[in-house]
Amino acid sequence: DIVLTQSPASLAVSLGQRATISCKASQSLDYDGDSYMNWYQQKPGQPPKLLIYAASNLESGIPARFSGSGSGTDFTLNIHPVEEEDAATYYCHQSEDPWTFGSGTKLEIK
């Protein structure tokens, strides 16, 4: 199975600043011109919400302050400017069978 190493485990960012979360895959996630990397946001008591799919595509209804980049084995989620409502845990996810997830990054807003 593909292992996703996500960092940092926790992050405290001041309101209006940038949050950057990294995810490294144990093998390339590039297939047929796409990168099979997705990013989710989860708040306590709620199901995960898809933010970014195929490395850099913004899911419908998600604010443009969320952006994704990367290819191959190295991927990044950026949030800028951070808002109070962005406090949550963020997960990277690869959608090659079998699916696997990163261990999560807890974002705190200062």
From Swiss-Prot:
Keywords: Adaptive immunity, Disulfide bond, Immunity, Immunoglobulin. Residues 24-38 are annotated as: Complementarity-determining-1. GO terms for cellular component: immunoglobulin complex. Residues 93-100 are annotated as: Complementarity-determining-3. Residues 1-23 are annotated as: Framework-1. Residues 39-53 are annotated as: Framework-2. GO terms for biological process: adaptive immune response; immune response. Residues 54-60 are annotated as: Complementarity-determining-2. Residues 61-92 are annotated as: Framework-3. Disulfide bonds join 23-92. Residues 101-110 are annotated as: Framework-4. Pfam families: V-set. InterPro entries: Ig-like_dom, Ig-like_dom_sf, Ig-like_fold, Ig_sub, Ig_V-set, IgV_Light_Chain. This is Ig kappa chain V-III region PC 7210. It comes from Mus musculus.
